[in-house]
From Swiss-Prot:
UniProt-listed Pfam families: DHO_dh
Predominant localisation class: membrane
Catalytic activity: (S)-dihydroorotate + a quinone = orotate + a quinol
Note on how the cofactor is bound: Binds 1 FMN per subunit.
Residues that coordinate or bind substrate: 69, 114-118, 183, 188, 257-258
Entry annotation: catalytic residues: 186 (nucleophile)
Gene label: pyrD
Protein name per the record: Dihydroorotate dehydrogenase (quinone)
Length: 351
């Protein structure tokens, strides 16, 4: 059980600039992991196993990518009770991201807007951090936690050359991942969402599937690949994506990323900032895409539901919409690590 009441930490952190608070938190987690300090945020892992994409998830609540972009805090995050943790997005080369300020809180809506832009230390540093984590050094047979590695393209890479970046990242992370997520839906890298269109997605996933086949043959292990999509899609676009995922043998879909829509936060401070909106206002849009995906993909295709989970009831709504497991990020910032256990128990109690 966590020794530190999150309300106290949140009051302090929310008095700071949003990105400065984020960096301070990540530094604290990185320094405190694998030490007695970890008891400050440690929570029991709820047991609710599920088999999905050939993997055994210890429970159905995971961490969404974006919180730990450089894979510095895997062990600290594992201690919060997640069944799986996804880190990244990583790009082949280090990049600073977009100019600051680039992260904003909308507390009245329990939301965030960010335009970070895949700021990260690059593939080599990312992989080195993954390799150093206890989750990896103790071996896959010893660690129950599943680790997802999320990959993207550099901002300076022309969109027509994006496939090259994804294949470079796939090759780099492949030996260390329980699953890989292909991020084609961040609104903060110019033209990235164009990769969700019919022809572009077909080309990208075809190349990824072929390269995954080569890596699996060489390394003797087939790593599941998920694709992360946006909530800002109509039913026709969702149907095309669903067909393309199945055509190329993708193992699952992560639905959804942040939204560029602002309907739910109009008039609030920072609502006009450019970037992706996350948190409570995204819940229904994300759930709508999940329902459409489930209808298009059938009952067996794995869906990771993410977007707007700030309570146990929100997590349950994702499962009822058609997700198999869920991820949280903004909810962790507003509600703290206790949300992980509450959500996992609520989902377990559905059965």
């Amino acid at each position: 059980m966590s020794l530190l009441p999150y309300a106290l930490a949140r009051s302090f952190l929310f008095g700071m600039d949003a990105e400065a608070a984020h960096e301070l938190t990540m530094d604290m987690l990185a320094r405190g992991q694998r030490t007695p300090l970890q008891w400050a945020w440690c929570n029991e892992t709820v047991s609710d196993p599920i088999e999905l994409a050939g993997l055994r998830f210890p429970n159905r609540v995971g961490l969404a990518a974006g919180l730990d972009k450089n894979a510095r805090c895997i062990d600290a995050l594992a201690a919060m009770g997640f069944g799986f943790v996804e880190v990244g997005t990583v790009t082949p080369r280090a990049q600073p991201g977009n100019p600051k300020p680039r992260m904003f809180r909308l507390p009245e809506a329990r939301a965030l807007i960010n335009r970070l832009g895949f700021n990260n230390e690059g593939l080599d540093a990312f992989v080195a951090n993954v390799q150093r984590s206890q989750v990896r050094t103790q071996g896959r047979g010893q660690s129950k936690l599943l680790l997802g590695l999320n990959i993207g393209k550099n901002a300076t890479t022309p969109i027509e050359d994006a496939t090259r970046d994804y294949l470079t990242c796939l090759e780099g992370v492949y030996p260390h991942a329980d699953y890989v997520t292909v991020n084609i839906s961040s609104p903060n890298t110019q033209n990235l969402r164009a990769l969700q269109s019919d022809a572009a997605l077909d080309c990208l996933l075809g190349a990824i599937a072929e390269h995954r086949g080569q890596l699996a043959a060489a390394q003797g292990r087939r790593v599941p690949i998920f694709v992360k999509i946006a909530p800002d899609l109509d039913e026709a676009q969702v149907a095309v994506i669903a067909t393309t995922l199945q055509r190329h043998g993708m193992d699952g879909v992560v639905a959804t990323n942040t939204t560029i829509r602002r309907d739910a936060v109009q008039g609030l401070r920072h609502a006009g900032e450019t970037g992706g909106l996350s948190g409570a206002p995204v819940l229904e849009a994300s759930n709508a895409v999940i329902r459409q995906l489930r209808a298009a993909l059938g009952p067996a295709f794995p869906i990771i539901g993410v977007g707007g989970i700030l309570s146990a009831e929100d997590a349950v709504s994702k499962i009822r919409a058609g997700a198999d497991v869920v991820q949280i990020y903004t909810g962790l910032i507003y509600e703290g690590p206790a949300l992980v256990g509450r959500a996992a128990k609520a989902i377990r109690d559905l059965r």
